[in-house]
Amino acid sequence: MKRILFCISLLAIVASVKAQQPAMRLWYNQPAHFFEESLPLGNGKLGALVYGGTQKDTIYLNDITYWTGKPVDPNEGLGKAKWIPEIRKALFAEDYRTADSLQHFVQGEQSASYQPLGTLNIINLNTGAVSNYYRELNLDSALAHISYQQNGIQFTREYFATHRDSLIAIHIKANQAGAINLHIQLTAQTPHKVKATNNQLTMTGHTTGSETESVHACTIVRLLPQGGKVIASDSTLTLTNANNATIYIVNATSFNGFDKHPVKDGASYIDNAVNAAWHTQNFTYNEFKDRHIKEYQQIYNRVKLQLGNKEYTNNLPTDQLLRRYSSSTAPLPEAAQRYLETLYFQFGRYLLLSCSRTPNIPANLQGLWTPHLFSPWRGNYTMNINLEENYWPADPANMSETIQPLIGFVKGLSATGKHTARNFYGINDGWCAAHNSDPWCKTSPVGEGKESPEWANWNLGGAWLVNALWDHYLYSQDKQLLQNSIYPLMEGSSKFFQQWLVTNPNKPNELITAPSTSPENEYITDKGYHGTTCYGGTADLAIIRELFMNMQQARKSLGLKPDKEMDDKLHRLHPYTVGSQGDLNEWYYDWKDYDIHHRHQSHLIGLYPGMHLQALAKQTKDSTILAAARQTLIQKGDESTGWSTGWRINLWARLGDGNHAYKIYQNLLSYVSPEGYHGKDAVHHGGTYPNLFDAHPPFQIDGNFGGTAGVCEMLVQSSVDMTAKKPVYNIHLLPALPDVWANGEIKGIRTRGGLTIDMKWENKLVTSLQIKAATDVDVNITYNNKSSKMKLRKGGIIKISSCK
């Protein structure tokens, strides 16, 4: 290997990295016929699914605050804690059947459901054959666009959802004066009324359920034509002989916070909607568009990625590109493969920016988008992986603004979680949250006494979430946020679990959880019992171990004295064990999994998204535990649901196996047919739908975000060493680079320690690098098989060039 000299200079101009990313766009040569073919738009609160039909353009509308339900009852489950000692008694007698049965007494009500706001239909009154159809979603500008010819006239529609101005806009034009003739209709699947007046449609309604106990909404659609005539009748606006037209959509709901009744204490949704409609007069369409693009690009443009060194012209429709990507008979050229892989990465960033900008209301299972009255799994917040996975790319992919809704949501959970801790578990200090939640910040176990404990009774959701918030601090280095928001949430969760731990009946010096479950998985005991409830589950202890270790670091960061009681309990936690097959045991005993390929790999949380598995291996100078994690992944296999596939990309990357991580990434990008399509060539498995939505199946957005995070993890990994007097951040560049990505460049990727990195690599070696620090920080940076220690100063820029 040629010797490389590292030329380092602070604020020096040595080698600037400017990633030349090609235009990022999804495009199609036909309208959408299914939800999974539609184009998603969102401003973080309002969402639209654009089908782009020529005779009837269906646009499903969503508002991320439009849910069933009302605030949780603080007395829900009061007295259920009495069953916990009985369950423990059964478990310690190895009577797992009785424990499973008793778990049903510690279940509460189901969570609320996320529901669609309404449907806007634009009906073309012109007739005649259509040709030259084109439909596009431009990720670089967050604009959707369709165009077609009819009777020799060129028609175009442009759509966007602006966060800055809180509206959705549609602009319709033709290249011939007076050619636009259409109906505009607004309807909903939930109870509603629509009124047409002058050039405006106003719809009021509420989610399913009692009118006096539901979230209400007011949606206003304004039609502003140039030329032509508008007639309002019933629930329809009719426009004839217009030159062009602009449609504005605004909405407000009565949702006023997790602890506010949506009717008795609801927001003034009608007044708020009317005020939003008035705002549409403040700017022209082009001005709204310019404001939208500028605000969006301030965040989106932070990260640019170029994989490979060959240009691609994007001359294949995205659905065909996706089909051929995994085809053995008509494989894509290398440049096309790299383009799709980059497009999927940026699509994940686009989605998170589009669905997570509302205070205290994070992205749900659907992100923001659903056409279904009752979405799969209620469209809720599933906290045993899915909600957490939604936010994996937020920091590394340089979109920290999107994580603020999650922080506010967890604050709400900490309030309701105190009641759950007391009523369901008999613990009066601290808080916890279970498996499913909603905007009302439900924290209690669900199931209503009849669902399987494997998912309904798990209570580690809050702990996993606060671990994610601590990780956000490591990226942001915002000590005020840590002190005022994140640390109090961590402390409350820690207090609960310090009391939840019990003495291991087999080894009195150890602490375990009881009852315990491993999310959605089932075991088979050595006596043949097929069950779900156990004690000392590995996933439980992994999350608690991560929490206590993070608490140690947080206290040190804030200058607080060590918590000796917590530290003692951390050291007493039942350790990881390795099974007879060399895998990491998921259960206290070396039991068989009912499904060895199960989608959840919860006992690997300490590897990713957690950090402690590698830390333990380093401290003990024993890699056995990492080898066991690897063997577990081998046993699991490479094919699973969409979100699980996204998780496995990151797990393999964390193990440093870039080629295997890439293989899983390829699986994630395998074509999946829309759910409503059942032709002979239909394909239904985990992967990606024609519009690049993640296929569980059905659609769940978490896999999109897991995939985007996985790309980041293959390119850059970071961790913190808190053992020294001052934290040292370890940065590893190209730690899991696939062979097929031997050349590339990225701009704007973030690391723990508050660093922003631009780099270029050739033949798997970094050739130019720029590091910008958000705060004073000590780093140990590893690349090209060498390590360098640096002290960076806030605002400083270090540029490094490899010199022969």
Locations of regions flagged by a protein language model:
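Aromatic-residue-lined binding/catalytic grooves and analogous aromatic/hydrophobic interfacial grooves
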Residues: Q20-E454, L460, D471-Y473, E491-S494, ...
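Loop/turn elements at helix/coil->beta-strand transitions in domains of secreted/extracellular proteins
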Residues: D478, Y487, P508-E510
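Well-ordered alpha-helical segments within folded domains of soluble proteins
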Residues: I385-D395, N459-W470, A539-M549, S602-M611, ...
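Bacterial Sec-dependent N-terminal signal peptides
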Residues: M1-Q21
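Short, surface-exposed recognition loops and adjoining beta-strand edges that mediate ligand/DNA contacts
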Residues: W27, P362-N380, F497-E520, W587, ...
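Acidic/histidine-rich catalytic neighborhood
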Residues: K495-A554
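Charged/polar positions within long, soluble alpha-helices
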Residues: N301, L353-S356, Q499-V502, N506, ...
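Non-catalytic carbohydrate-binding regions of carbohydrate-active enzymes
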Residues: W470-S476, L481, S485, S493-T503, ...
